[in-house]
């Protein structure tokens, strides 16, 4: 945890200090976030801002403790799936009608992201979207070219995607054998995010329409889970990949070990920081999720900014939240972090889209972005989903019982049973 004080004009003992908690959205957030808000601070003499950088591993506990005690920052960043829980705890200040009017009632932001500033089935908006995580297929253009695979066809639908993986699997490029696809297995934080788009594109969902029950056992969801699992059963995802987490696999993809990986815009930072002339840096592109029977939606998440309920400086905190929710600061943050802006106009700004062709493609893919229902119980629900669905990796890798559709269905049944208990207890 790192804290840094930023002062506007000449600091005085009587200066009003705002406390701001953020996550490490850039590689040096302790420097970059104060630099991002420096113009706002300069325009507000007598105000100082203390920026504290939390980490994703311990941030949840610190934020929930603050919400429970009403002792915390004036404003803070919240992951989009965290926000409903903290709002439901009474930890966030809802935006007033006047404040909502100042941000045009959310019109500048992607609708799916604006939805995450609310609590499902309840009135009230608790913040503004700050930056976005949109998922896409990152693939090696040199691998596809050597295998004679047309990327446009490869990502057209599920069958063509599987056919393309079969053709690139095991191909040798530049003296290195390349596995077709990387996705993480047991206990990885991306388990649900990786699987959800396949479920949506099959016509299924992670929850029922009223968000009161799990929907993983519908025929559509089961079809998607089976297709996704069969990629590993067939060997298109190496069994050792299923034992690794997303961070390790992303590094291995950048190192040239895999042909395809589904990831988010942060991977661009890793690619662009690779040594000049590296294989992947010179030979990669992105594509949307292969279309299923019901489209090619992708996971859409990110982070929001909110005012802490216990703040004694809510007006000043809102002014800073509103500033950071503006177009220019969001474009600037995207250039610092490689995360996509949460505003539609910022995500289409040439400063972002022309930085690299992939950024423009991510903006286009975001048009099909889809967020989870903003329920307070998402945290414990995701833990259940991650635990059970992560165990599919053991089945597909042949550890213990071998994969079969009945075994998969039994595992999903257990998942749904436990998930429904979590949802029932949360009501």
What are the functions of these language-model segments?
Residues 145, 151, 367-427:
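Conserved C-terminal helix/tail region of periplasmic/extracytoplasmic solute-binding proteins
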Residues 109-110, 114, 281-288, 335-387, ...:
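Long, aromatic- and glycine/proline-rich binding clefts that accommodate carbohydrate-like moieties
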Residues 80-136, 191, 281-290, 351-355, ...:
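Hinge/lid segment of periplasmic solute-binding proteins
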Residues 118-130, 135, 159-214, 258:
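Extracytoplasmic/periplasmic solute-binding protein
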Residues 35-112, 146-148, 153-156, 251-252, ...:
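Extracytoplasmic "Venus flytrap"/periplasmic binding protein-like
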Residues 96-111, 154, 172-173, 179-186, ...:
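Short, solvent-exposed loop/beta-turn-alpha elements that line the ligand-binding surface or hinge
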Residues 162-167, 210-242, 285, 289:
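Glycine-centered hinge/linker elements that transmit conformational signals in sensory
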Residues 38, 42, 123, 147, ...:
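Extracytoplasmic/periplasmic substrate-recognition and gating elements
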